[in-house]
């Protein structure tokens, strides 16, 4: 009996001592070792003023980009995990006068693309659109807004005063949650100082 207790005590001590050496053989990762790709040019731009880009990735490792071109229209592009173009630069804001600023993007669990931005044409508005890239053949050429849009340009918020800097995320039900900075205050209690507003969109 005493011999069995002694063996189990020795075994426990050995396990505790050996467990301290488990992590010693793991090599430390540095930033230069975890870079997956070299920097690549997403859009050549040329005479265009492409700015304010946002990016997210889907379940297959494809990357989805949205940006403002000439601070007028919103553009979208999709690359595969190797950086090859699946959908080329495509205007996704509706035709007409726009002033697209500060877009944000989130890909949901069904690989649908949720986008929000500020339209500064006239009274500033927070906008939203929903894209389904799988509706395109993803052959590397442009598509059209009508071909991949599930929800067209939807007005999330438009009041007196101005609003800007929207951000978006999605939940486990793929519903969109949008926050933004807004100077609208119906009771005029804060002298039009920016407030934070939030809205959930059930898709």
Question: What role is predicted for each listed range?
Answer:
Residues 31-203:
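Extracellular, repeat-based ectodomains that mediate carbohydrate processing or recognition
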Residues 1-32, 178:
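Secretory targeting signatures
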């Amino acid at each position: 009996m005493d011999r069995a207790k002694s063996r189990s005590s020795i075994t426990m001590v050995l396990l505790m001592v050996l467990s301290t050496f488990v992590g010693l053989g793991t090599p430390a990762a540095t930033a230069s070792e975890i870079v997956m790709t070299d920097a690549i040019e997403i859009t050549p731009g040329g005479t265009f003023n492409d700015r304010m880009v946002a990016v997210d990735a889907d379940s297959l490792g494809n990357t989805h980009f949205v940006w403002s071109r000439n601070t007028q229209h919103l553009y979208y592009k999709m690359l595969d995990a190797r950086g090859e173009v699946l959908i080329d630069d495509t205007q996704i804001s509706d035709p007409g006068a726009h002033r697209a600023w500060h877009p944000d993007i989130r890909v949901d669990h069904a690989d649908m693309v949720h986008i929000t931005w500020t339209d500064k044409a006239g009274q500033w508005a927070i906008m939203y659109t929903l894209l389904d890239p799988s509706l395109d053949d993803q052959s590397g050429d442009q598509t059209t807004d009508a071909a991949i849009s599930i929800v067209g340009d939807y007005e999330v918020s438009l009041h007196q005063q101005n609003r800007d800097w929207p951000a978006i995320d999605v939940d486990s039900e793929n519903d969109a949650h949008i926050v933004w900075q807004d100077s609208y205050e119906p009771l005029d209690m804060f002298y039009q100082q920016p407030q934070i507003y939030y809205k959930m969109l059930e898709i």
